[in-house]
């Protein structure tokens, strides 16, 4: 049996489930690149369809706590098959490597907590800029993120006025603040620049339903263009097909809702 690292997954993500989805890459072009950002060269994975007519709509894919491992790369490939230029930047690259951590608690304390939100949001701006120079249509800029990246997706929707649509998968909505994380999504409900779809699990112990309802109330009070869907039979990381938390019916429904959200709000093709 392959280990998580041999399989391309972060060690802290173990044990691996037997439900891993592997997207064929015959019709896409995918690989690694380096994106100039804030004086550094940020590693990133990108995927796009082989055949395209003009600049492509862009989806930035924001990693889980595990970094840009095989699941996130496969998300990019799935989006490429739908006609998008999908880019997943390594947002922890300055602070460390998720593969150096054997379990989730040490990964959270030893790496994730050290990454400032402000740095991440600026890095994502540079990803959008890179996309505009590499076959992407910046007028059709979207973002999606999972777990840690779901929270970042909410924050980025309040950060970048060029963003057209966002889909946040089970990202934290409320919680403690720190120097690196001065705001939570509930604090920026009044500042959203783009419509946001939130996809959450009703059985998620790490994101209580009370916090989901608090966010809904904040969005309603702000008259924000946003929607939160809760899947009653799903827990946290229900789209993570490589983990025991995977809930296929909820994941498949969420994926279709994401694609519809992008089509509805993602902007018009540039002439």
From Swiss-Prot:
Database matches in InterPro entries? AB_hydrolase_fold (IPR029058), Dienelactn_hydro (IPR002925), Dienelactone_hydrolase-like (IPR051049)
One MF term in the entry's GO annotations: carboxymethylenebutenolidase activity
Instruction: List its EC numbers.
Output: 3.1.1.45
Catalytic activity, reaction form: 2-(5-oxo-2,5-dihydrofuran-2-ylidene)acetate + H2O = 4-oxohex-2-enedioate + H(+)
* Keyword tags: Hydrolase
- Catalytic machinery residues: 147, 204, 236
Q: State the source organism's domain of life.
A: Bacteria
Tell me which Pfam families the record gives. Answer: DLH
Which family does the similarity line name? Belongs to the dienelactone hydrolase family.
Q: This chain belongs to which protein, by name?
A: Putative carboxymethylenebutenolidase
Q: What gene does this protein come from?
A: ysgA
């Amino acid at each position: 049996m392959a280990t998580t690292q041999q399989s391309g997954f972060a060690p802290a993500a173990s044990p691996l489930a037997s439900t891993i989805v592997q997207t064929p890459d015959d019709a896409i072009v995918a690989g690694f690149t380096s994106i100039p950002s804030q004086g550094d060269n940020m590693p990133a994975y990108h995927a796009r369809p082989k055949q395209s007519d003009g600049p492509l709509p862009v989806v930035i894919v924001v990693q889980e706590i595990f970094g840009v491992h095989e699941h996130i790369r496969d998300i990019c490939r799935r989006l490429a098959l739908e006609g998008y230029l999908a880019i997943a930047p390594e947002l922890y690259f300055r602070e460390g490597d998720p593969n150096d951590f054997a379990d989730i608690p040490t990964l959270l304390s030893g790496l994730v907590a050290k990454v400032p939100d402000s740095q991440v949001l600026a890095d994502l701006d540079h990803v959008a800029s890179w996309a505009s120079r590499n076959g992407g249509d910046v007028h059709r800029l979207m973002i999606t993120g999972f777990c840690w990246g779901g929270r970042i997706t909410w924050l980025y929707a309040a950060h970048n006025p060029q963003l057209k649509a966002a889909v946040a998968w089970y990202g934290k909505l409320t919680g403690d603040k720190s120097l690196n994380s001065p705001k939570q999504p509930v604090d920026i409900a009044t500042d959203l620049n783009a419509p946001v779809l939130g996809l959450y699990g009703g059985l998620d112990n790490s994101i209580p339903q009370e916090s989901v309802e608090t966010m809904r109330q904040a969005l309603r009070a702000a008259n924000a263009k946003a929607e939160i869907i809760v899947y009653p039979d799903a827990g946290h990381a229900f789209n993570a097909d490589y983990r025991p938390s995977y809930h296929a019916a909820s994941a498949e429904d969420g994926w279709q809702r994401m694609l519809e959200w992008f089509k509805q709000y993602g902007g018009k093709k540039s002439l």
